[in-house]
């Protein structure tokens, strides 16, 4: 739960912009080129634009936002994108409102409050590794907090590795003219993760408190080879094959987690 600071009387609108960004990775091993192609096809169908639209629609509901517009696209040969414009105020139906215009709050939000997702399936040309990355951004302006959707997004995708960034920008002014650069308590994104998620992941923080920048990355603690094999079972592999595949997968996970290639 997002813990607010003591209630402030504001001069006008809350102009704080809060942005939460995810890079979520699913890692897989597919032995043959045909299996790798089927993995790409599976991921492409599992996370097509329709499914992603439903996930982002759920996010909007969770954070208490109103949907203004939805744009979505499936790409050839693979990948999908969805962008949803949101506001914290109800949208006025112009037909029902007569000559009344859409409220200033809605107009103010349209360039700042949005939820987007882009997917990137890919495979290694030789070693059998296949990965799926989903980039998700939830940006809000006002009292709505994107942190409320944190746990839902992690659970909605096959999240072997999760890289998260949260930042607060701008300021809001109280009735005495004092500027406030953040309106809730936070010292880590981990504060907002559910206990069952924290128990499953190894986590690492890099935070710049004075700049209202918070970074958390995490990967699953337990390694079960069967969870990473596509159309295959570990029991059907020789010991030597299992060790080789496990080493490849663990190296891939480490490199994605640290964001760099590791030395041989």
Swiss-Prot record:
Catalyses: S-adenosyl-L-methionine + H(+) = S-adenosyl 3-(methylsulfanyl)propylamine + CO2
Recorded metabolic or biological pathway in which this protein acts: Amine and polyamine biosynthesis; S-adenosylmethioninamine biosynthesis; S-adenosylmethioninamine from S-adenosyl-L-methionine: step 1/1
Q: Which NCBIfam families match?
A: SAM_DCase_Eco
PANTHER family membership: S-ADENOSYLMETHIONINE DECARBOXYLASE PROENZYME (PTHR33866:SF1)
Alphabetically, which GO biological process terms does the record hold?
spermidine biosynthetic process
User: Could you give the subunit structure recorded for this chain?
Assistant: Heterooctamer of four alpha and four beta chains arranged as a tetramer of alpha/beta heterodimers.
**Record-annotated active site:** 113 (schiff-base intermediate with substrate), 118 (proton acceptor), 141 (proton donor)
Query: Member of which family?
Result: Belongs to the prokaryotic AdoMetDC family. Type 2 subfamily.
Q: What is the name of this protein?
A: S-adenosylmethionine decarboxylase proenzyme
Give the free-text PTM comment from the record.
Is synthesized initially as an inactive proenzyme. Formation of the active enzyme involves a self-maturation process in which the active site pyruvoyl group is generated from an internal serine residue via an autocatalytic post-translational modification. Two non-identical subunits are generated from the proenzyme in this reaction, and the pyruvate is formed at the N-terminus of the alpha chain, which is derived from the carboxyl end of the proenzyme.
Q: Which residues carry this modification: Pyruvic acid (Ser)?
A: 113
Q: Copy out the cofactor comment.
A: Binds 1 pyruvoyl group covalently per subunit.
Enzyme kind, highest EC tier: lyase
What is the protein's known function? Catalyzes the decarboxylation of S-adenosylmethionine to S-adenosylmethioninamine (dcAdoMet), the propylamine donor required for the synthesis of the polyamines spermine and spermidine from the diamine putrescine.
């Amino acid at each position: 739960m997002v813990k607010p600071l003591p209630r402030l009387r504001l001069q006008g609108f809350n102009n704080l912009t809060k942005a939460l960004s995810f890079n979520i990775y699913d890692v897989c091993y597919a032995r043959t080129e045909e299996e790798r192609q089927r993995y790409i096809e599976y991921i492409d169908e599992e996370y097509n634009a329709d499914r992603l639209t439903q996930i982002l629609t759920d996010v909007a509901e969770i954070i208490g936002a109103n949907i203004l517009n939805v744009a979505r696209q499936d790409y050839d040969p693979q990948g999908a994108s969805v962008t949803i414009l949101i506001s914290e105020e109800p949208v006025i139906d112009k037909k029902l409102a007569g000559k009344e215009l859409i409220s200033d709050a809605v107009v103010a939000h349209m360039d700042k409050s949005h939820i987007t997702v882009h997917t990137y399936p890919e495979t290694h040309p030789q070693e059998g590794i296949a990965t799926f990355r989903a980039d998700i951004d939830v940006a809000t302006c006002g009292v709505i907090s994107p942190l409320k959707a944190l746990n839902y997004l992690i659970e909605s995708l096959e999240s072997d590795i999760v890289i998260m960034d949260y930042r607060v920008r701008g300021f809001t002014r109280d009735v005495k003219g004092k500027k406030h650069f953040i309106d809730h308590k936070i010292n880590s994104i981990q504060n907002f993760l559910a206990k069952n998620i924290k128990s499953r992941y190894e986590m690492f923080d890099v935070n710049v408190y004075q700049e209202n920048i918070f970074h958390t990355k995490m990967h699953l603690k337990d390694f079960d080879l069967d969870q990473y094999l596509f159309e295959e079972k570990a029991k059907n592999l020789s010991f030597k094959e299992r060790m080789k595949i496990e080493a490849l997968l663990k190296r891939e996970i480490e490199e994605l987690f640290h964001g760099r290639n590791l030395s041989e």
